[in-house]
C-alpha cells in the first residue's frame, strides 16, 4: 500500500485525481493531512512529488479499496475534459467521464465524514447514460450510500470570488455524512482587491520557472496586431489565416467567437486552459508578444512562488502548461477547505 505516514491529529485526507496538487495545496494550508494521493498523469505526478509528497501513479481501476487508508475527507477532481467547453464534450460517453464511479466505489468502502468533488461548469449540463442529469446521479449516489449517505450541496463558483486573479467557473460538490447532521454552507464571496494582472505579473527576476512556451509564426503575426485589452477582432483582415477569414466572414454563423483575447493589466484574466493556446484562452501577455511564462500562469492559478515546476526541456515546458491549466486554483481550494474545517472538524 502506498500511503503517507500519519504524523499528527489533523483530519486525514485521501486525494483522488490529484493532478499537480492545486486542490491538495489549499487543503493542506487549511489544516488537513494528506494520507494518500493518486493521479495517472506522469507530468502531474512529477510536480506533485517535487512539492507536496508521495503520490500513487497507478490507474485508479487497479487500486483496491483496501489499499487506501481510512480518512476523514475524500477529495476528487476527476477528469474534466469530457465535460469541458475546451474539450470535445463527450461527457459520460468518454471513458474518462465515468471515472467518478471509481470515486463512488472507494467512498462506499471508506465512508469518510466529508466528500468533495470538483469539476468544470459543463458537468452541470451533462446527461448520464440513462438520460438523467449527471449532477442528479452524483447526488443520488452519495445520498443513498450504504444506508447512511451524505447531505450533498453543490454550487457553481467563480475562482475570482475567492482570491484568484482569473474568471474560472468550477462546480463543487460537498457531501457531509448524514450521521454528522450538518449541511455545508459554501464560503462567502471575497472582495476582488488586487486581482488584476498588473499585480500578478510583477515578478522578481530571481523567482524560478520564468520561461515561456514559444509561439508559432502564424500566432506571432496575429498577436502583433492585437492591442492590450483587444482580441483577434483587431487583426486586419489581410493578416488573418484562411480559417479565421472564413469565420470573420460569417460571425453570426460561428456565434461571434472572441479568439486571441489579450487581457489588459487592469483586468482579471480569463480562464487558463490545459492547452494554453492563444486561440481559446487568455494566455497572451498584455504588453509583450508572447505567451505567459510558466510562473505567470502559475501565479494566475495562485500557486505560490515556492511551488516549483519542471522546465528543463521543451517537452517539460509544454507539459507544465497542461498540468497548471488542469489544476484547481490553490486559493479557491483553500476557501472551500477552510469552510469545511471550520464547519465540520473544528473543535472535534
Language-model features: locations:
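Class I S-adenosyl-L-methionine
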Residues: 63-73, 83-259
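Conserved SAM-binding strand-loop segment of SAM-dependent methyltransferases
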Residues: 53-60
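C-terminal target-recognition/interaction regions appended to catalytic cores
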Residues: 222-348
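Conserved proline-anchored active-site loop of SAM-dependent methyltransferases
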Residues: 13-27, 60, 70-87, 114-120, ...
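Short phosphate-binding/catalytic loops that engage adenosine nucleotides
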Residues: 32, 53, 147-150
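Short alpha-helix immediately C-terminal to the canonical SAM-binding loop
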Residues: 42-46
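Conserved SAM-binding motif I beta-strand of class I
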Residues: 34-39
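Phosphate-coordination loops involved in phosphoryl transfer and adenosine-cofactor binding
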Residues: 8-10
Amino acid at each position: 500500500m502506498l500511503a503517507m505516514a500519519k504524523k499528527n491529529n489533523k483530519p486525514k485526507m485521501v486525494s483522488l485525481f490529484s493532478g499537480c496538487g492545486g486542490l491538495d495545496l489549499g487543503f493542506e494550508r487549511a489544516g488537513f493531512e494528506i494520507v494518500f494521493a493518486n493521479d495517472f498523469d506522469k507530468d502531474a505526478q512529477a510536480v506533485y512529488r517535487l512539492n507536496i509528497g508521495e503520490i500513487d501513479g497507478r490507474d485508479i481501476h487497479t487500486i483496491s479499496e483496501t489499499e487506501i487508508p481510512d480518512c476523514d475527507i475524500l477529495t476528487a477532481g476527476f477528469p474534466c475534459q469530457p465535460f469541458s467547453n475546451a474539450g470535445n464534450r463527450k461527457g459520460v460517453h468518454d471513458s474518462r467521464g465515468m471515472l467518478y464511479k471509481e470515486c463512488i466505489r472507494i467512498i462506499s468502502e471508506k465512508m469518510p465524514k466529508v466528500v468533495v468533488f470538483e469539476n468544470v461548469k459543463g458537468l452541470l449540463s451533462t446527461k448520464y447514460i440513462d438520460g438523467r442529469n449527471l449532477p442528479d446521479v452524483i447526488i443520488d449516489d452519495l445520498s443513498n450510500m450504504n444506508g447512511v449517505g451524505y447531505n450533498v450541496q453543490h454550487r457553481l463558483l467563480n475562482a475570482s470570488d475567492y482570491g484568484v486573479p482569473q474568471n474560472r467557473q468550477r462546480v463543487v460538490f460537498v457531501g457531509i455524512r448524514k450521521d454528522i447532521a450538518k449541511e455545508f454552507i459554501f464560503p462567502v464571496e471575497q472582495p476582488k482587491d488586487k486581482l488584476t494582472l498588473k499585480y500578478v505579473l510583477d515578478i522578481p527576476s530571481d523567482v524560478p520557472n520564468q520561461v515561456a512556451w514559444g509561439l508559432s509564426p502564424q500566432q506571432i503575426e496575429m498577436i502583433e496586431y492585437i492591442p492590450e485589452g483587444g482580441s483577434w477582432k483587431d487583426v486586419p483582415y489581410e493578416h488573418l489565416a484562411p480559417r479565421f477569414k472564413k469565420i470573420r466572414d460569417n460571425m453570426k454563423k460561428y456565434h461571434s467567437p472572441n479568439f486571441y483575447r489579450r487581457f489588459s493589466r487592469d483586468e482579471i484574466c480569463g480562464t487558463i486552459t490545459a492547452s494554453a493556446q492563444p486561440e481559446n484562452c487568455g494566455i497572451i501577455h498584455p504588453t509583450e508578444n508572447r505567451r505567459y511564462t510558466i510562473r505567470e500562469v502559475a501565479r494566475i492559478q495562485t500557486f505560490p512562488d515556492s511551488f516549483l515546476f519542471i522546465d528543463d526541456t521543451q517537452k517539460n515546458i509544454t507539459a507544465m502548461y497542461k498540468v497548471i491549466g488542469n489544476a484547481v486554483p490553490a486559493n479557491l481550494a483553500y476557501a472551500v477547505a477552510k469552510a469545511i474545517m471550520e464547519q465540520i472538524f473544528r473543535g472535534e
